[in-house]
């Protein structure tokens, strides 16, 4: 009984991992089909970095370290910048 249960759970875990990996590959292939050149991808990355640093609300008090406030819309403050979670 225990062996059967372990086998079923193992198969279920493998199926979930396989499905997740397949979805990631499909998403990557769709990005590649768009045909976006590397220079445009670099520009998008720069925009995201700017977006992260701008969307984080940080308050300075004199010479003290920054106090992190809550970021909005799925962003989390980390290292004085917002990071998408």
From Swiss-Prot:
Q: Which UniProt keywords apply?
A: Disulfide bond, Neurotoxin, Postsynaptic neurotoxin, Secreted, Signal, Toxin
Full protein name: U4-theraphotoxin-Hhn1ab
The entry's propeptide annotation covers 23-48
**Organism this protein belongs to:** Cyriopagopus hainanus
Compartments, as annotated in UniProt: Secreted
Recall the GO molecular function terms of this protein's record: toxin activity
Write out the similarity annotation.
Answer: Belongs to the neurotoxin 12 (Hwtx-2) family. 02 (Hwtx-2) subfamily.
Pfam families named in the record: Toxin_20 (PF08089)
